[in-house]
Amino acid sequence: MAHEWNGNTRRQFRAFSRGPWLLFGILTLLITTGCQTNPYTGRWQLMMMPMSQEVQMSAQAYADVKSDPKMKPSTDPREIEPVKRVAARVIEAAKRSKYSEMANQFEWEVTVIKDDKTMNAFALPGGKIAVYTGIFPVAKTEAGLAAVMGHEVVHALARHGGERMSQNTLAQTTLQAIGIALGVSGANPVLSQAGMAALGVGAQVGVLLPFSRKHESEADYVGVLLAADAGYDPREAIQLWQRMGELSGGKSSSEFMSTHPSHETRIQQLEEWMGEAMPIYQSKPPAPNHELPPLH
């Protein structure tokens, strides 16, 4: 029995001694395939997907949304004109920003979706933007809408979607490599499965969720700078999230288990960024700031 145990121990040791080198080789290969630095925050970003593929996938997703019979485009000029007006200003600000090269390459397109029950907007790599009319009551004004659109445009320009896909690929590959090492080591299968499950949860909570929150904060930060450069009062972003908090009844899910920062965290961060955003806004001619139309 002792001899068998020692043999298993030696096999496990050899497997795990190879494991770190296996992981190191995989991580090195994946990481060196592509990376970039965020021009605003200096944050290093893993990018394993070419931009052309992101744009192609986004174009297909945008076409699917537009062709969905449930997603009817608005035909009301009162809804379309303010969205197009704000989008034009935010896009021009993006073309002057540190993302100027990408922003000028995008083929921008804006669609207003008549869906009064959905508080949403999105921007995809390649410049495809959709705004749901359900966001109007919480945005309230064109400046509030600029805060929303600035945030979404930054997600596209910063390639947050591509980065998340890269992070998922890296996490899955790492877990697979660990699984192989556990299997080769002759470890107890039940314990191995439990360990892999725990590692999966750890990757989600410890790596992927914080990165998602970081993406949201990054989009809030750069988005408010774009809105200010477009001539919109950046303080509207604070009021926007205060209204979001009121609509949620003051309740927000645990930030630890959420892909988004809490409303309180967002408001606090936005207040801190006003020292940078307000001088930009004050140096620009003010943009029109009409109230958005009521839902009907």
Question: Which residues does each predicted region cover?
Answer:
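A Zn2+-metalloprotease active-site environment signal
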Residues: A2-G7, F13, S17-L23, L27-H296
